[in-house]
Amino acid sequence: MSIITGKTKLLGIIGHPVEHSLSPVMQNAEIKRLGVDYIYIPFPVKPENLETALDGFATIGVMGFNATIPHKQAIIPLLSEVTTTAKLVGAVNTVWRTEIGWKGTNTDVIGFVTPLKALNRDWNTIKPIILGNGGAARAVVVGLAELGCRDICVVGRDKDKLGQFKQSWDTSELQASITVHSWDELSGMVSESQLIVNTTPIGMFPHTQNSPVDSNLWEKLPNNAIAYDLIYNPSPTQFLKDAKQQGLTVIDGLDMLVYQGAAALEIWLQQPVSATVMSEALKQSLFS
């Protein structure tokens, strides 16, 4: 894409606010490399205008779009079709046009699991710990279940919200795989875990010195354990710095951001894309 014409196909992201989104940077970088006549645009859409926006997108021929806060749950009843993955997560982040209307899925799941698959572990034997019980934790639970994990521990600080999180899976096939635990239990659990995932915002810019766990926690984990932080700014976080200092394998939130975006672009374009190009564009935007 170099010049926008009457034939240029529209992609984008809806949110409120959406001005801070990094998706246009990485998506347009790969669109340019591929030489396809598309452009990816941020669309600020207030919650009360969501249905109107979808009608407008259909009218002007938008081919597909990402949905971010606060639309990832609210958009579901407005879609003609939703994938099983998105239903399990309870949120949609990627939407595309079909013959019967809009179809939605959640590429956060594939974004999360792709870096883990590259490690070639026996996931059936791994007992992961998830820090936090918000929306991001739901995608992580679904991803871990897809990998084959059958004993998924979710740790949170608010007892009521933890209970609600657990209850929200009661009608799901994953219900038996999930246990919830208070933060006080964490220290006694980590010696049996080979994967710890931070889904909380603790350590996010500008509070870069913070970590959701004490630095001495890492010495209790097995030597082959993996630390995964969904935060991508800073890169690495204090959480990952402490884990790496202990010699553990670390995965940055930038990987998840890139792979979920690449998965969405492949759905829209129906062709393979380069996650490397998207990653480099993001790093340049964030850190140069």
From Swiss-Prot:
| Entry superkingdom | Bacteria
* Biological role: Involved in the biosynthesis of the chorismate, which leads to the biosynthesis of aromatic amino acids. Catalyzes the reversible NADPH linked reduction of 3-dehydroshikimate (DHSA) to yield shikimate (SA).
Q: Does the keyword Glycosyltransferase apply?
A: no
What keywords are assigned to this protein? Amino-acid biosynthesis, Aromatic amino acid biosynthesis, NADP, Oxidoreductase
Enzyme Commission (EC) number? 1.1.1.25
Q: Name one GO biological process term.
A: chorismate biosynthetic process
Name the residues that bind shikimate: S21, L22, S23, T68, N93, D108, Y232
Protein name per UniProt: Shikimate dehydrogenase (NADP(+))
Enzyme class of the recorded protein, top EC level: oxidoreductase
State the GO CC annotations: cytosol
Name a GO molecular-function annotation. Answer: shikimate 3-dehydrogenase (NADP+) activity
User: Which pathway does this chain act in?
Assistant: Metabolic intermediate biosynthesis; chorismate biosynthesis; chorismate from D-erythrose 4-phosphate and phosphoenolpyruvate: step 4/7
Q: Which NCBIfam families match?
A: aroE, PRK00258.2-2
Spell out the reaction equation it catalyses: shikimate + NADP(+) = 3-dehydroshikimate + NADPH + H(+)
Please name the Gene3D superfamilies in this protein's record. Leucine Dehydrogenase, chain A, domain 1 (3.40.50.10860), NAD(P)-binding Rossmann-like Domain (3.40.50.720)
Please tell me whether the keyword Amino-acid biosynthesis is annotated for this protein.
yes
The family database entries (CDD domains) matched by this protein are listed as: NAD_bind_Shikimate_DH
> Binding positions for NADP(+)?
G132, N133, G134, G135, A136, L230, G253
Q: Name one Pfam family in it.
A: SDH_C
Active site positions, chain numbering:
K72
Q: Which family, according to the similarity comment?
A: Belongs to the shikimate dehydrogenase family.
Subunit relationships: Homodimer.
